[in-house]
């Protein structure tokens, strides 16, 4: 996303030649700031990204993007987490737990969306070529909260406080039915803070979130978004040991059209539906079926966005 201009033009030409009309700009948040500090935008790399957006727009190609994907921090940036933030999965958990991290997120979102692209003349929030915004990439709280044992302990302590305030039993920890209510409350509080900031800066772009994993709990959270977005992979490599990975080498068809079929129940009848990451992973012998299955079902169910 921050490539030299000549590469932006070449890639935009190539995408237009193939007939693509939408590109997702991804993993750029770490490149567009200096040292992970959201208060210090990297002007040169942001300029390159602006040029890419403009180059795509000139060829009739729209853009969608994320606010947080993989930005990392040196020591001392997050008061409650003084050590360096090297694992971006931890950010998604810290975002729920601490106001300071949410404030950092809102600051970067405000800066990047209010920034004027010199090649289009639009602020990102007003640019018609930028069609939608994803907030935090793959941030399902049901799968993220306990990945870091230190942060999981904080979650459980907060849950006990949550139960005391409501005169609920806290036994069972995360197995307690009230634990999901606790997680949902944390998430909805943050989502409303984001919504309020977007209203404040005058951003009316469609917004989505919770694009990782599937299930009723996440469907309820996606109802609070403007559209549903899902990520889906067939035969994603499975780690074996420290360095080796293996593939199943299975077709999706005898697996009940696992991909894209697994996303069918995730649609919400009153919301546009998108898949911003989908792939039959390289080295799978059945990758040729991907285009036929994906195109057929996307047309049958009238999906609104598909990005490989």
Feature names for model-found ranges:
Residues 56, 61, 190-206, 217-235, ...:
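Catalytic-core region of carbohydrate-active enzymes that cleave or remodel glycosidic bonds
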Residues 1-225:
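Active-site mouth of glycoside hydrolases
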Residues 237-243:
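Short, charged, surface-exposed secondary-structure boundary motifs
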């Amino acid at each position: 996303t921050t490539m030299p201009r000549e590469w932006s033009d070449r890639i935009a030409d190539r995408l237009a030649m193939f007939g693509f009309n939408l590109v997702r700009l991804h993993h750029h948040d770490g490149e567009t700031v200096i040292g992970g500090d959201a208060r210090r935008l990297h002007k040169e790399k942001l300029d390159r990204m602006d040029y890419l957006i403009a180059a795509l727009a000139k060829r009739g190609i729209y853009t969608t993007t994320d606010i947080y994907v993989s930005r990392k921090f040196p020591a001392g940036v997050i008061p409650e987490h003084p050590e360096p933030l090297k694992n971006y999965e931890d950010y998604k958990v810290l975002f729920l737990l601490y106001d300071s991290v949410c404030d950092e997120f809102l600051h970067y979102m405000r800066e990047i969306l209010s920034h004027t692209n010199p090649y289009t003349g639009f602020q990102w929030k007003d640019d018609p070529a930028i069609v939608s915004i994803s907030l935090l990439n793959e941030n399902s709280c049901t799968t993220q909260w306990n990945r870091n044992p230190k942060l999981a302990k904080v979650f459980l302590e907060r849950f006990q406080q949550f139960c005391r305030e409501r005169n609920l039993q806290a036994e069972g920890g995360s197995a307690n039915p009230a634990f999901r209510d606790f997680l949902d409350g944390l998430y909805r509080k943050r989502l409303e803070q984001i919504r309020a900031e977007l209203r404040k800066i005058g951003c009316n772009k469609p917004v989505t979130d919770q694009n990782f994993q599937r299930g009723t709990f996440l469907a309820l959270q996606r109802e609070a978004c403007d559209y549903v977005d899902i990520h889906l992979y067939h035969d994603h490599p499975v780690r074996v040991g420290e360095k080796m990975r293996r593939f199943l080498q299975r077709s999706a068809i005898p697996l009940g059209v696992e991909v894209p079929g697994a996303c069918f129940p995730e649609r919400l009848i009153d919301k546009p539906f998108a898949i911003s990451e989908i792939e039959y992973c390289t080295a799978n012998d059945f990758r040729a079926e991907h285009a036929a299955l994906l195109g057929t079902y996307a047309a049958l169910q009238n999906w609104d966005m598909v990005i490989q």
